[in-house]
Amino acid sequence: MRRPLVLLCAGLTLLSSSAAFSQNATPRNLILFIPDGLRAAKVTPETAPAMAAVRDKGVNFKNSHSLFPTFTMANGSAMATGHYLGDTGTFSNTIFTGYTSVPAGDTVVPFIENDAVLGDIDEHFNGDYLNEDTVLKLARKAGYSTAAIGKLGPTYLFDHTGCPCKPGASSSIVIDDSTGNKNGVPITDEVKDAMTKAGLALATPSRGDNGKAGDAKTPGTTSANVPQQAYMVDVATKVVLPMFKARNKPFVLVFWSRDPDGSQHNHGDSLNTITPGINGPTSMAGIKNADDNLAALRKALDDLGLSASTNIMVQADHGFSTISKESKTSPSAKVGYDDTPKDFLPMGFLALDLAKALDLPLFDPNDKNAAVPAGKHPKAGNGVLGKDPTKPDLVVATNGGSDLIYLPNNDRKLARRAVKALLEQDYVSGIFVDDKLGEIPGTLPLSVVNLDGKAVTPHPAIVVNFRSYVAPGCDVPSNCSVEVADTVLRQGQGMHGSFSRGDTYNFMAAIGPDFKAGFVDPLPVSNADVGITAAKLLDLKVAPKGKLIGRVMTEAMPNGATPKATSDVIKSDPAAGGLRTVLKLQRVGAQRYFDAAGFPGRTVGLDDAAPKQKAAAK
């Protein structure tokens, strides 16, 4: 196979980009707005006028990239630190921690979109499991006013080690789903008083109907997450921004909009059918909701006289795809389950199929390590395989459009057996294996996609990408990608996490005094670049531990340098049956940007002609 170039430390990038930034007499403010799960090509002046205005009047990052695995916490960690996942250790939304996390429900595979779980993981990894400083933490320590408002999990991640719980301690203002309850991040009396004066409750309202995913017989929600996010916008515009202006010093505000992600996941527009999938009315209402939030923030900046001194960076964490639950090869799809339509893949299909192929007992880490009986699937899809569930040979962390496999004993023979089993399944499209396990035909090493770095959390042994194709009757493949997903959600609902271009093509734009106006950036950019660029805009002193770092997007700045980009393809050696993992990428200097990866014919965006398939309805 072709070995990739070694990624150089981006410290050189940071140093060489200083010419792009003028020395401002007054430091600028910065707002990072994240419309979770927003596909780049879905933004038009009609569907999302506020975001289209930022893109068209500011900088249009038309060649944008989410990091693989394309999940929220993974990409949140990249935006927060400027590092790739091999350094942050946030390999997906559900990871193997190597210990039992009590706040996560006594499991070794916690779902980490949870403040208490993040705090618990921090405690087990020297107080900061990311092992890299976040932009918001550095800004706070540099004297900026700082706040993070929005979706539970990634919002707190931006300053997860600060806490106002001790006298004299500094922290960012954090407002998320848990604010006001026992598991929420505490808020100061100053913020509480301001919220009360503004007529706002001290507890965040629930998602209500937007949180209802339905089941195999009941459609999910038809409501966007409007009331909850309206509350968060009110906190930002009526409390936080006026407070920051009154302090008369620069600020950084992170606003993480759960929509359109939540509406695209849970929508009830397409139960068990591929179309309209994530292009139905509920998903579009979610896009509008996020857009309305951005419009409200920009209006508040205007009203407060802050627009001229505020840079706004808008970037989605990932794209999105419609879920498929179809497979002709999976043994688990041939078993009947009470909660799964006939012949559809059940939640946890990867753990079930591997247990059968490897002839290993399967236990449920989300059910007190109980054995998974015949005809049942793991409650959350995760699985621990081996004779002793407390000392597993193999762990499956279920996530969605891709899954993580851990081998706690670093068993090379088991790794090869697992890969052989994966290659036999039609739902697999691309396999990445820990470099330390050696080269395995049909797979590429984790280092090729920047998943092998200085992370302190356990590294996955194998990352499995699932098959994707373009829904029938679609003219824009990235808008209607369909992917096999290991999830409780149903065929026709929404998911991400795969290496398809539908999931890697996230919306990105920027506007403000330190960005060009009306500029279309042809160069590849990524969510890791967001973190590093934010740090440079704020003139923060960063001391990275890992070397998997993004680059400052100098080409988007007045008088900034414009580097050159090239494209490339990396192919693994073929497996016995001829399958090979192929990675389509671009380069800017030593930086690599990953468009799509998988087996040819099974991943959207990998081939010249996007794979298409007629989908059955159930």
What positions do the PLM features span?
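A contiguous, mid-domain pocket- or channel-lining segment that forms the substrate-recognition surface
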Residues: G119-T237, V252-V254, R258-Q264
